[in-house]
């Protein structure tokens, strides 16, 4: 899923709408559509009905913000999420980590002449994500940009997201006067009931060891696995990382 303003998704006309007031709503609509099509088959495109308690379950794998969206959805009553995988994110993010993430996103190159320049840029800003092969870097570069009108490339990411962050976080996620206390979703976490796996980069500045340990003892009592030598956030492109997720999703254990 490409969240609005990113990847192949459209950019919002009203830039102030970027934020967690919009993202979970979009994701819930997508899940309802997917569940409906799985339930109704070929007729789904002709008959639109809201998802019900009998909707098929869906597994959610989310990195960073995608994990927060998944957590918010999994905390809802009658959530269709069967199993939840959070990649290097938890219900608490310190203000230092938030500031660091904002600065990282602000290191934005407006235009690239070719995909080699895209790769060079990504190898720099994404270095702590972990090692990739040349072929994987080429794949990441190709899917991180779109062609610009002048024949070059631009990041597939609306720069207005950063300017909207200050407004949205203050008004909707309590990053105003409470900013110094960090981003706190512990009540949401404690409402999650589905089996949950958390992958944590051992060098992560976003998901601290203390937060991960608390996640193991509260809410869905997540299974925590550290990915050694990696910061925020593991690529989930290596065979071992993919295998960890596959084994969790295919586990015969019944959901909580």
Language-model regions, residue ranges each:
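Active-site loop/oxyanion-hole signature of alpha/beta-hydrolase fold enzymes
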Residues: 3-61, 244
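Conserved hydrolase catalytic core segment
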Residues: 53-97
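Conserved alpha/beta-hydrolase catalytic His-Asp/Glu region
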Residues: 113-170
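Conserved catalytic-core motifs of eukaryotic protein kinase domains, centered on the activation segment
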Residues: 9-16, 96-97, 209-210, 237
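Short beta-to-alpha linker loops that shape the active-site pocket of alpha/beta-hydrolase fold enzymes
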Residues: 2-6, 90, 228-231
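Catalytic histidine-centered segment of alpha/beta-hydrolase-like enzymes
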Residues: 230-239
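Conserved serine/cysteine hydrolase catalytic core
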Residues: 146-214
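A catalytic-pocket lid/entrance helix-loop region that shapes and gates access to the active site
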Residues: 89-117
């Amino acid at each position: 899923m490409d969240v609005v303003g990113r990847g192949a998704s459209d950019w919002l006309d009203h830039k102030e709408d970027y934020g967690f007031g919009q993202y979970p709503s979009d994701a819930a609509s997508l899940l309802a559509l997917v569940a409906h099509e799985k339930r109704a088959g070929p007729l789904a495109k002709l008959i639109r009905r809201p998802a019900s308690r009998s909707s098929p379950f869906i597994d959610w794998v989310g990195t960073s913000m995608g994990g927060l969206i998944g957590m918010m959805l999994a905390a809802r009553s009658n959530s269709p999420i069967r199993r939840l995988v959070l990649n290097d994110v938890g219900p608490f993010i310190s203000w230092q980590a938030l500031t660091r993430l904002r600065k990282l996103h602000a290191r934005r190159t407006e235009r690239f002449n070719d995909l080699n320049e895209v790769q060079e840029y990504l190898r720099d800003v994404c270095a702590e994500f972990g090692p990739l092969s040349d072929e994987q870097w080429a794949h990441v570069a190709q899917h991180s940009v779109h062609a610009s009108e002048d024949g070059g490339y631009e990041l597939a990411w609306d720069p207005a997201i950063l300017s909207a962050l200050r407004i949205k976080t203050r008004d909707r996620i309590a990053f105003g006067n409470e900013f110094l206390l960090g981003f706190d979703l512990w009540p949401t976490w404690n409402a999650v009931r589905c089996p949950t796996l958390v992958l944590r980069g051992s060098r992560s500045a976003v998901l601290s060891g203390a937060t991960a340990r608390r996640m193991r003892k509260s809410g869905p009592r997540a299974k925590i696995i550290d990915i050694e030598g990696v910061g925020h956030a593991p690529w989930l492109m290596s065979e071992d990382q993919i295998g960890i997720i596959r084994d969790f999703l295919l586990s015969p254990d019944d959901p909580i």
